[in-house]
């Protein structure tokens, strides 16, 4: 999860998030290259004493500043498209869990376990235990397995919401009347936090998401819920 004064991204807990972190570094290198070239051109223009008022065109320079940006855009677009198709790929998920957004809480339905349904509300400050995170703890966590592809089917009962867990690289809009889906595979156990990432009304800031990831063997014994 995020920490105070954190400058980097959260630690990746899924292959997709690992790819996103790598792509972030890749795009940042391209940005540094562009910034360096622009700053160099500006400094050279300001410091040089060489001038020529008879120049009418510069074919070589125009060719360079046309081809170079095109090459940079291709180098950014190719890995971006690869990750885009990776996030949309659905390959025989082991489990399917449905998440329904409401103003202002989440409902989870385990379709593979007899249609078990429960709500997940943010814990008010008066109910927090020492060490709990303010505005991030919930009464019922969604329990998910690691090392197995899990399909999340996400929709909304009222207005637009967005089911987001940054460390898993997940952000899927919950749209009324529409069922969106995303698949992820978590790589290590733990408790991971997210929040609704679509402004959905007065209490938008008070509908957190808490996913408790446990080993697959334990999950297969029967989901463990904090009900």
From Swiss-Prot:
Cu cation A1 binds at residues 161, 196, 200, 207. The chain crosses the membrane at residues 15-45, 60-87. It is a multi-pass membrane protein. The keyword Mitochondrion applies. GO terms for cellular component: mitochondrial inner membrane; mitochondrion; respiratory chain complex IV. It comes from Theropithecus gelada. GO terms for molecular function: copper ion binding; cytochrome-c oxidase activity. Residues 1-14, 88-227 are mitochondrial intermembrane. Mg(2+) binds at residue 198. Binds a dinuclear copper A center per subunit. Its main location: mitochondrion. The gene is MT-CO2. Its EC number is 7.1.1.9. It is an enzyme of class 7 (translocase). This is Cytochrome c oxidase subunit 2. It is found in: Mitochondrion inner membrane. Belongs to the cytochrome c oxidase subunit 2 family.
